[in-house]
């Protein structure tokens, strides 16, 4: 049966700013307090969506969160009208206002973990919103994420939605940024690959010393159970703690997989040979031929991988059977990385083409092409059941660019977050967006 991988990219929200909120994310920390350009950021993301759509890939849109989140601020003791809440927070606790104004939901690889129907016990596509409990500014996302996903995938015959895991450190879950899937064809049963940074309950697993490991083994196992995955179709691997301490805060900063191919750095995992052997064996039993492309540290150091976001790329299957690697401009600007990519595409391997995108606004906050998208493999009848308002078309692209032009600012600094007018601008924009994308009422300000 025909099936497609659809990339649902996060639409950058109107409060996109450089708050430096993500400890362990080198780019986020190093660009803290710089002036951002929300309008440019949103258009850069939309340009990538349009370009991939025009290349023949299925492309969708995931709406941003409503920010500033005044409900979160109220839960922290700020009272009065929404405007007074913002004013008080700006005066008394600016870091909290910055956190509650973050546009980090643009990185939809962290929105949820998705298992296609070919892998699940009940034959439906399963979604579990990520609790993102390692960072306060992201931990407040999942209630809205769940409502948005339910509005996009709203046919219970085809789609099952699970609430986020318990919001405690033992079940820290960062979603699809630590998950990929291997398969012969998108509609076939595949092998789901869960990567964790530490175990909450088993001290035999090592842990990083400098930066936190955001994903636990126990969270991965819980999601696999919720989705009804069989043991024959799951592989768990531990990310190398040493690379977490070098700024690899999610596995999609050090590896990317698609189809039968895993593109990874030599230092990405612990027990690499054992992990690759299990993937090879389990995918082979499901009719596939697993292939790993290992990037040696002598050719690309971990530091270069983090700076360029070589692995935070999209690996896409083309109609001719070859693969396209979508990378940020920073890869072309790094001589060692670019030399490697030129050699890679010159080999007789599956990755034959590299396409470069300017995503500087997102990159400066620590998110590349892979961060910006949530992959959902859908059979034809499942794709037909998706809310059509969120599927990218030439017309929707034009509508969204015009919407951005009407509502977004072209510069935003920390002081601007204290402007109560920003809240009204954002709510007006998002109220209109839910009509454009045919989502109904998904934001708290629409439900109150």
From Swiss-Prot:
Pathway per the UniProt entry: Amino-acid degradation; L-arginine degradation via AST pathway; L-glutamate and succinate from L-arginine: step 2/5
Binding site for substrate: 19-28, 110, 137-138, 214, 252, 365
InterPro entries linked: AstB_sf, SuccinylArg_d-Hdrlase_AstB
Reactions catalysed: N(2)-succinyl-L-arginine + 2 H2O + 2 H(+) = N(2)-succinyl-L-ornithine + 2 NH4(+) + CO2
An individual GO BP term: arginine catabolic process to glutamate
Active site: 174, 250, 371 (nucleophile)
Keyword list, A-Z: Arginine metabolism, Hydrolase
Gene Ontology MF: a single term: N-succinylarginine dihydrolase activity
Cited SUPFAM superfamilies: Pentein (SSF55909)
EC identifiers of the protein: 3.5.3.23
Binding partners and assembly: Homodimer.
Reported function: Catalyzes the hydrolysis of N(2)-succinylarginine into N(2)-succinylornithine, ammonia and CO(2).
Protein family: Belongs to the succinylarginine dihydrolase family.
Record-linked HAMAP family: AstB
Name of the protein this chain belongs to: N-succinylarginine dihydrolase
Natural source organism: Pseudomonas paraeruginosa (strain DSM 24068 / PA7) (Pseudomonas aeruginosa (strain PA7))
This protein's encoding gene: astB
């Amino acid at each position: 049966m025909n099936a497609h991988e659809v990339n649902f990219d996060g639409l950058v929200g109107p409060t996109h700013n450089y708050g430096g909120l993500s400890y362990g994310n080198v780019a986020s920390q190093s660009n803290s307090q710089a002036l951002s350009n929300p309008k440019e950021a949103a258009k850069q993301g939309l340009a990538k969506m349009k370009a991939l759509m025009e290349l023949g890939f299925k492309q969708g849109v995931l709406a941003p969160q409503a920010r500033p989140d005044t409900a979160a601020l109220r839960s922290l003791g700020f009272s009065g009208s929404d405007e007074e809440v913002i004013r008080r927070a700006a005066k008394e606790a600016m870091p909290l206002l910055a956190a509650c104004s973050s546009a980090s939901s643009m990185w939809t690889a962290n929105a949820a973990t998705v298992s296609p129907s070919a892998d699940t016990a009940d034959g439906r596509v399963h979604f579990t919103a990520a609790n993102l409990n390692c960072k306060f500014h992201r931990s407040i996302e999942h209630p809205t994420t769940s409502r948005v996903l339910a509005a996009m995938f709203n046919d219970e015959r085809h789609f099952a939605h699970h609430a986020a895991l318990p919001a405690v450190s033992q079940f820290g879950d960062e979603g699809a940024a630590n998950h990929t899937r291997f398969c012969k064809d998108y509609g076939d049963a595949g092998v789901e690959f869960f990567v964790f940074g530490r175990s909450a309950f088993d001290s035999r697993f090592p842990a990083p010393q400098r930066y936190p490991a955001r994903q636990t083994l126990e969270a991965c196992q819980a999601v696999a159970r919720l989705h009804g995955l069989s043991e024959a179709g799951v592989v768990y691997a531990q990310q190398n703690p040493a690379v977490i301490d070098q700024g690899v805060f999610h596995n999609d900063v050090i590896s990317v997989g698609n189809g039968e191919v895993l593109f990874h750095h030599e230092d990405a995992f612990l027990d690499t040979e054992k992990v690759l052997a299990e993937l090879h064996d389990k995918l082979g039993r499901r009719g596939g031929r697993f292939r790993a492309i290992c990037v040696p540290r002598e050719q690309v150091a971990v530091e270069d991988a983090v700076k360029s976001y070589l692995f935070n790329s999209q690996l896409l299957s083309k109609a001719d059977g070859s693969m396209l690697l979508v990378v940020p401009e920073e890869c072309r600007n790094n001589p060692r990385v670019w030399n490697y990519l030129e050699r890679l595409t010159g080999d007789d391997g599956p990755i034959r083409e590299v396409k470069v995108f300017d995503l500087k606004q997102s990159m400066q906050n620590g998110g590349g092409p892979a961060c910006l998208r949530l992959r959902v493999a859908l059979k034809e009848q499942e794709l037909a059941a998706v809310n059509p308002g969120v599927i990218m078309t030439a017309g929707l692209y034009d509508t969204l660019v015009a919407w951005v032009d009407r509502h977004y600012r072209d510069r935003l600094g920390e002081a601007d977050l204290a402007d109560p007018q920003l809240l009204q601008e954002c709510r007006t924009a998002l109220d209109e967006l839910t009509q454009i994308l045919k989502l109904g009422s998904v934001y708290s300000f629409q439900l109150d």
